[in-house]
Amino acid sequence: MDALEKGAATSGPAPRGRPSRGRPPKLQRSRGAGRGLEKPPHLAALVLARGGSKGIPLKNIKRLAGVPLIGWVLRAALDAGVFQSVWVSTDHDEIENVAKQFGAQVHRRSSETSKDSSTSLDAIVEFLNYHNEVDIVGNIQATSPCLHPTDLQKVAEMIREEGYDSVFSVVRRHQFRWSEIQKGVREVTEPLNLNPAKRPRRQDWDGELYENGSFYFAKRHLIEMGYLQGGKMAYYEMRAEHSVDIDVDIDWPIAEQRVLRFGYFGKEKLKEIKLLVCNIDGCLTNGHIYVSGDQKEIISYDVKDAIGISLLKKSGIEVRLISERACSKQTLSALKLDCKTEVSVSDKLATVDEWRKEMGLCWKEVAYLGNEVSDEECLKRVGLSAVPADACSRAQKAVGYICKCSGGRGAIREFAEHIFLLLEKVNNSCQK
């Protein structure tokens, strides 16, 4: 997360759930306020994503649960429907390409605002200098993958309808704080927010509000005065399970599990997967073919993948295999996977479509694991798609999930686990 030290106007604590006022002088409302006939103020979402992250190199586009990190917040911002424009400010070509793939516009960040010492405020001011049409900036942190559109919708309403100059996200925590011991200065610690003689139970204490770094919304005139927080300001309290911030490597596996359970996966409701189609060469196998002395072909697969297929079938998901190559019957029978298989397929999409209709399924109920250009159309068409880590670049660009495992090295088992987690989300949403 970019430094924010320059961007806050100091103010005293506010009562719980109440707005607080910052130090800047009384601010003029943005043009058009209170005039129903004038064009509403331009609210722009801005994600700052420079390429020089020190904690995790290029972390903004590192895959989290199969999706580039920045993709989670871009999806939420675009689907919120409250922004006139959604931008990514970056100095890196790869980040720019990913941002455009998700539908965001790109502001090329200057070298001056891409330094380790540069602050978020520096980059936002630069963005505003190039975009006079923008009246309000919603600075969304790329490192907060559990952000939901509903959070952004409510904050936009607070800014537009309730007249706040700035709104920032917080999370409620129940943590007791103690002063730091410093040799030669303070030899003992002191409680900062509790009486040790009367330690409250969690349920008897409201806790405290902490910034969680997910977003900072502010009006243009406030930012131009040098503040991200000030004027008539308020906090927006996010749910604890949605308050995820990734800074170092140790945060990554925790965030991955959290986003799979609590992340936002798009507007369309998840469907229960009923059919998984898997390409044989490069997905089930590693793509290598060995030929014995008697001219028989030999292929291998990972036992973990066989177990993954078995678990899918036990959960009621049909698993079928497909290949454009003419695999021999002896080779297929030797796999002992008991899956319907189609080989020498010139049009994989037509074959999968035929299977789908045969089972009475919609495309959203079909999953596909592929790795080649010939799989591209299937990957784009199905409800859930994935590729192994070593898939070709065109296949990778067509999917929503890229496995950590390579083909023939556990990719099917990994994708199966991903499917099970999504099915859990489907079941939970149905219960709600």
UniProtKB/Swiss-Prot annotation:
GO terms for cellular component: nucleoplasm. Residues 18-29 have a biased composition (Basic residues). GO terms for molecular function: N-acylneuraminate cytidylyltransferase activity. A motif (BC3 motif) lies at residues 267-274. Substrate binds at R50, N60, R109, S118, S120, Q141. Coiled coil: none annotated. A motif (BC2 motif) lies at residues 198-204. The active site is at R199. A motif (BC1 motif) lies at residues 15-31. GO terms for biological process: CMP-N-acetylneuraminate biosynthetic process; glycosylation; N-acetylneuraminate metabolic process. Keywords: Acetylation, Methylation, Nucleotidyltransferase, Nucleus, Transferase. Belongs to the CMP-NeuNAc synthase family. This is N-acylneuraminate cytidylyltransferase. The gene is Cmas.
